[in-house]
Design a protein with these regions (language model features):
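A conserved active-site cap/scaffold subdomain adjacent to cofactor or substrate pockets
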Residues: 226-298, 302
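Alpha-helix C-terminal capping segments
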Residues: 137-148, 171-173, 191-197, 215-217, ...
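Short internal beta-strands
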Residues: 148-158, 262-268, 275, 346
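Conserved small-residue-rich beta-alpha loop and adjacent elements
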Residues: 102-168
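C-terminal core of ALDH-fold dehydrogenases
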Residues: 316-424
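N-terminal Rossmann-like NAD(P)+-binding subdomain of aldehyde/semialdehyde dehydrogenases
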Residues: 1-118
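Conserved NAD(P)+-binding/catalytic subdomain of aldehyde/semialdehyde dehydrogenases
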Residues: 174-245, 249-252, 256-261
Length: 424
């Protein structure tokens, strides 16, 4: 049963404690990366057989496999994918940054070019649920950014094939190449390249402890989006909120994983107790009730504060992945929210909307990193290059200042490179 605690009566350590993965996979992941780097496809296939219990002859999804998957996918679900994709494109298209040029001084031009990375790798977890939504959320921003090739890697099922709904989502989103591999071996393949998998410049997407550690270890060889931890939700609610709604929202994240975190922060003890009772009613109704039970009992908590301002202060300190703001006039509080991956406003906006259909991204910072990190966006798939042009006359006007600055730093070679062009 979820624990109720009164803010101010328990330690901050208890209030702000988070679930943390306890398994140490650093050495195991390093070995996987080394093998894939040295042996390419052969190593990826061996690890796929070892971890996923399936032999793969070809790491890439063929056109025939894609066609078969599309015929097996319910047309109504494909229509839902297309509707979700349209909303995701509409939102992320507003994120596109423009290059700029400044030439308001004679003989001087400075500017910035926004350039997409050449190739992006997208990781989509397999496991107990096919995450076709993650395909849309991670591939579409890359395509909007202008990435030339998007590689999608996801583990195969026991039949050696990718779930048809995942392939259908890949088709809708525009993935260019699909790799039947998961785990650290897939991250290594995209980071270093193999016979079948070209090297990516950026790798994005959530995953288990092996995937997270692999992304950490290959960072610097490639860029990554973030190192994602377990799923999180914090519901900030006043006493007028419907306890059944709040319990359902908490369970929507608790069912993800046994180490997922579901937290309610409220100014009403009465509501807290009603939500606790609702959780006990609703958990047995879930298909993934065993997972949700462990998550709620081990990592769930209800925090009761004196007022809504304190509720918001607690939310900012926790900096959750998902934050639901279940209060009257939620936009009055929006400016007070400083740290959250994604905020769901009002009493009729469950975070499931954001997971699938609303349009904003669902690949979000976890473990408090929302204090300094952002959701996945078009920005993750572009880089910026600056450029500078000076005529000889424009250089002459600044050469003395450049030289003085350089000499102050003890870099006389810098000074000379500016002055030599103005002599004679």
């Amino acid at each position: 049963m979820i624990r109720i605690m009164k803010y101010g009566e328990v330690s901050n350590e208890e209030i702000f404690a988070r679930s943390m993965p306890t398994v140490n996979v650093t050495d195991a992941v390093a070995e996987i990366i080394r093998n894939v780097r040295e042996r390419g496809d052969a190593a990826v296939k061996e690890y796929t057989e070892k971890f996923d219990k399936v032999k793969t002859e070809n790491l890439l999804v063929s056109p025939e496999e894609m066609t078969e998957a599309l015929t097996k996918t319910d047309p109504e679900f494909i229509a839902i994918l297309e509707k979700a994709a349209a909303n995701i494109r509409k939102f992320h298209s507003r994120q596109v940054r423009n290059s700029f040029i400044i030439n308001d001084e004679p003989g001087v031009v400075v500017g910035q070019k926004v350039i997409p990375v050449d190739r992006a790798g997208v990781y989509v977890p397999g496991g107990t649920a096919p995450l076709s939504s993650t395909v849309l959320m991670d591939v579409i921003p890359a395509k909007i950014a202008g990435v030339k090739e998007v590689i999608l890697a996801t583990p195969p099922g026991k039949d050696g094939k990718i779930d048809p709904s995942v392939l259908a989502a890949a088709k809708v989103a525009g993935a260019d190449r699909i790799v039947k591999a998961g785990g650290a071996q897939a991250i290594a393949a995209m980071a270093y390249g193999t016979e079948s998998v070209p090297k990516a410049d950026k790798i994005v997407g959530p995953g288990n402890a092996f995937v997270a550690e692999a992304k950490r270890q290959v960072y610097g060889v490639v860029s990554i989006d973030m190192i994602a931890g377990p799923s999180e939700i914090l519901v900030a609610a006043d006493g007028k909120s419907n306890p059944a709604y709040l319990a359902a929202d908490l369970l929507s994240q608790a069912e993800h994983d046994k180490v997922a975190s579901a937290v309610l922060v409220t100014d009403s003890m009465e509501l807290a107790e009603k939500v606790r009772d609702e959780l006990e009613k609703q958990i047995p109704q879930l298909e993934r009730s065993e997972i949700a039970r462990v998550s709620i009992d081990n990592n769930g908590k209800i925090i009761v504060a004196d007022d809504l301002k304190t509720v918001i202060d607690i939310a900012n300190e926790i900096a959750p992945e998902h934050l639901e703001l279940c209060v009257d006039n939620p936009f009055d509080w929006l400016d007070s929210i400083r740290h959250a991956g994604s905020v769901f406003m009002g009493r009729n906006c469950p975070d499931a909307l954001g997971d699938y259909m609303a349009g904003p991204n669902h690949t979000l910072p976890t473990q408090g990193t929302a204090k300094f990190s952002s959701p996945l966006s078009v920005d993750d798939f572009v880089k910026k290059t600056q450029y500078t042009y000076f005529t000889k006359e424009a250089l002459a006007a600044l050469a003395g200042d450049v030289a003085a600055f350089a000499r102050k730093e003890g870099l006389t070679g810098h000074a000379r490179s500016a002055l030599i062009r103005t002599e004679g």
